């Protein structure tokens, strides 16, 4: 099978999952799945989520190499799904305290299933830029990664946080550093300077998880 369209249609047929059910599982519109199945979209950024939802080999689905791997490997024994949370933009994140209670389903860019300690009170953001990408450190979050943010989790020095400076409409993603009475928002990338914060910043939430999609 040479195309993503052929492989996805084959996987849907074998698993008995409909396009609408697959779209619901990964929190996107059915139209997006339909475009892949019809061949209108030769690639998809949702390939990893589709593979997880169908319990097939993600590498096979993306490239055609290897075996389909129905219900095997880490897909079969993956962590329990705890709920679905909205992937929002950085302006929405900056106003999350005000908009969270009345947030409408269609206001999200997409809805993502979450695992582990995340819960339905969390939200997700797609990382922009390379300020949190550390070329030499163990902790590094690249551009394009999806972070799961928990507004209810207490923060401390060293926490990765989403915050909004008083003079900005957008939220920002940094590491919180507390040194005595001084507080800073510190990028993990040493090429960027730390930002002093002392009463001019709101911590919106603590990052629980980072998810990296390879396709």
UniProtKB/Swiss-Prot annotation:
Record key words, sorted: DNA-binding, Repressor, Transcription, Transcription regulation
Top-level taxon: Bacteria
PROSITE patterns for this protein: HTH_CROC1
Gene3D superfamilies (UniProt xref): lambda repressor-like DNA-binding domains, Umud Fragment, subunit A
Pfam families (UniProt xref): HTH_3, Peptidase_S24
Positions of disulphide bridges: none
SMART domains recorded: HTH_XRE
Domain spans labelled HTH cro/C1-type: 8-61
Acyltransferase as UniProt keyword: no
CDD domains given in the database record: HTH_XRE (cd00093), S24_LexA-like (cd06529)
DNA-binding region: 19-38
GO MF annotations, alphabetized: DNA binding
Described purpose of this protein according to its UniProt entry: May control the expression of the integrase and inhibit excision of the mobile element R391, and regulate the expression of other genes as well.
PANTHER family for the chain: LEXA REPRESSOR (PTHR33516), LEXA REPRESSOR-RELATED (PTHR33516:SF2)
Protein name: HTH-type transcriptional regulator for conjugative element R391
């Amino acid at each position: 099978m040479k195309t993503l369209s052929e492989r996805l249609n084959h996987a849907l047929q074998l698993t008995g999952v409909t396009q609408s059910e697959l779209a619901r599982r990964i929190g996107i519109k059915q139209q997006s799945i339909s475009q892949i199945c019809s061949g209108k979209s030769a690639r998809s950024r949702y390939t990893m989520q589709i593979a997880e939802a169908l319990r097939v080999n993600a590498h096979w689905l993306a490239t055609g190499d290897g075996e389909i791997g129905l219900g095997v490997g880490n897909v079969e024994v993956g962590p329990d799904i705890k709920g679905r949370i909205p992937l929002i933009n950085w302006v929405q994140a900056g106003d999350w305290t005000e908009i969270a209670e009345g947030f409408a389903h269609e206001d999200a860019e997409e809805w993502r299933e979450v695992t582990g300690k995340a819960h339905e009170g969390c939200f997700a953001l797609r990382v922009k830029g390379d300020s949190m990408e550390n070329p030499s450190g163990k902790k590094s979050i690249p551009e394009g990664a999806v972070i799961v943010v928990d507004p209810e989790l207490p923060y401390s020095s060293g926490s990765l946080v989403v915050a909004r400076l008083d003079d900005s409409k957008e939220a920002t993603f940094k590491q919180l550093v507390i040194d005595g009475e001084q507080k800073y928002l510190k990028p993990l990338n040493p090429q960027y300077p730390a930002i002093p914060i002392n009463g001019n910043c709101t911590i919106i939430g603590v990052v629980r998880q980072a998810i990296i999609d390879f396709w």
